C-alpha cells in the first residue's frame, strides 16, 4: 500500500506547501499594495484544484481501498463518514480560533500600515495586548496547518503526482494566509522583519503535522486506515475550499475572476490526471 521510497518526496512536498506562508509574509514585507485581482484568481484556482481532485480522485480512491477490506455497502458508508469527519475536524478547529487571530480572516498589505498608524504608540497596555494577539496568530496558523500537512503528506505518499498537485494548491492557499498572520504580528511588534519571521516559521507546523501523523499512524497503516484517512483528507480539502478559499477570493476580487480561477484549477487538475492514466 505504501512505498517507503515516497516518504522523503512526500515530506519535501509538505515542507514546500507549509513554507509558502513565507511568500505571503514577504509580500507583506516588501509590497506597497496588494494585487487583489491576482489573489482572487489564485485562490479560486487553488479551490478548483482541491474540489476537483477531492471528489474525482481522492474520494474514489478511498472507496476503492476500503472496498478491498469490506463489503461495497460498508465501504460506501465508511468513505462518506470519514469524508464528513474530516470536514468536521477542520470546522471545529476554525471555530475555536477567534476573529482576528484566525489566519483565514483575510487582510491586505495596505491594512497593515493603516492599522499600525491607528495604534496609540505610548500605551504599554496596548503593546502587551497586541503582542499577545500576535503570538495567538502564530499559534492559530500552526493549528490550522497541522491537518493540512497530513493531507498533503498522505496524498503524496499514495501517489506522488497527486501529491504534487495538492501541495501546489495548498501552497497557493498559504500565501494569503501568511499575509493574514503578518498583520497582527506587525501590530504587536511594529517590526516587518519579525512579522515575516513569525509567519514563515508558523508554516513549519505543516511538515510537522505530516511527520507526527506518519510516526503515529505508521504502525497502524493498514489499507483500512489508509482508506479512512484518504476520505477524511478529501473532506478537509473541500471544507477549506468552500469555507475559506472561495469566500476569500470573492472578497479580494470580482465574482467572475473567482469563477475563472476555479474552473482553471479544475481544468489543470483534470488534464494532469488524464495525462497520468
Swiss-Prot record:
Gene assigned in the entry: zupT
Annotated catalysed reactions: Zn(2+)(in) = Zn(2+)(out)
Keyword Cell division: no
One GO term describing the cellular component: plasma membrane
UniProt cross-references to PANTHER family, sorted A to Z: ZINC TRANSPORTER ZUPT, ZINC/IRON TRANSPORTER
UniProt KW Secreted keyword: no
The species this protein was found in: Nitratidesulfovibrio vulgaris (strain ATCC 29579 / DSM 644 / CCUG 34227 / NCIMB 8303 / VKM B-1760 / Hildenborough)
Keywords tagged on the record: Cell inner membrane, Cell membrane, Ion transport, Iron, Membrane, Metal-binding, Plasmid, Transmembrane, Transmembrane helix, Transport, Zinc, Zinc transport
Gene Ontology molecular function: any one: metal ion binding
Binding site for Zn(2+): 148, 173, 177
Localization terms from the record: Cell inner membrane
Record-listed Fe(2+) binding positions: 145, 148, 174, 177, 206
Family per similarity comment: Belongs to the ZIP transporter (TC 2.A.5) family. ZupT subfamily.
Membrane topology recorded in Swiss-Prot or TrEMBL: Multi-pass membrane protein
Summary of the function given for this chain in its UniProt record: Mediates zinc uptake. May also transport other divalent cations.
Residue ranges of the TM segments: 7-27, 38-58, 73-93, 133-155, 165-187, 196-216, 220-240, 257-277
Location, primary (coarse class): membrane
Listed name of the protein: Zinc transporter ZupT
Amino acid at each position: 500500500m505504501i512505498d517507503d521510497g515516497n516518504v522523503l518526496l512526500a515530506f519535501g512536498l509538505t515542507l514546500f506547501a507549509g513554507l509558502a506562508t513565507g511568500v505571503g509574509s514577504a509580500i507583506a514585507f516588501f509590497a506597497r499594495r496588494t494585487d487583489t485581482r491576482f489573489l482572487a484568481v489564485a485562490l479560486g484556482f487553488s479551490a478548483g484544484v482541491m474540489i476537483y481532485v477531492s471528489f474525482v480522485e481522492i474520494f474514489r480512491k478511498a472507496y476503492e481501498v476500503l472496498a478491498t477490506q469490506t463489503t461495497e455497502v460498508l465501504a460506501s458508508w465508511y468513505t462518506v463518514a470519514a469524508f464528513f469527519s474530516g470536514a468536521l475536524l477542520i470546522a471545529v478547529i476554525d471555530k475555536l480560533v477567534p476573529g482576528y487571530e484566525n489566519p483565514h480572516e483575510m487582510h491586505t498589505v495596505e491594512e497593515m500600515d493603516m492599522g499600525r498608524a491607528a495604534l496609540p504608540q505610548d500605551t504599554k497596555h496596548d503593546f502587551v495586548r497586541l503582542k499577545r494577539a500576535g503570538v495567538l496568530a502564530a499559534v492559530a496558523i500552526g493549528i490550522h496547518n497541522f491537518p493540512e500537512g497530513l493531507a498533503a503528506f498522505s496524498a503524496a505518499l499514495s501517489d506522488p503526482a497527486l501529491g504534487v498537485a495538492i501541495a501546489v494548491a495548498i501552497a497557493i492557499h498559504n500565501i494569503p494566509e501568511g499575509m493574514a498572520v503578518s498583520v497582527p504580528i506587525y501590530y504587536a511588534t511594529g517590526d516587518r522583519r519579525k512579522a515575516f519571521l513569525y509567519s514563515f516559521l508558523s508554516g513549519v507546523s505543516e511538515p510537522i503535522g505530516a511527520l507526527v501523523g506518519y510516526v503515529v499512524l505508521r504502525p497502524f497503516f493498514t489499507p483500512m486506515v489508509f482508506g479512512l484517512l484518504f476520505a477524511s483528507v478529501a473532506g478537509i480539502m473541500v471544507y477549506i475550499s468552500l469555507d475559506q478559499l472561495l469566500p476569500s477570493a470573492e472578497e479580494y476580487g470580482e465574482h467572475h475572476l473567482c469563477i475563472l480561477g476555479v474552473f482553471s484549477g479544475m481544468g489543470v487538475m483534470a488534464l494532469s490526471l488524464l495525462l497520468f492514466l
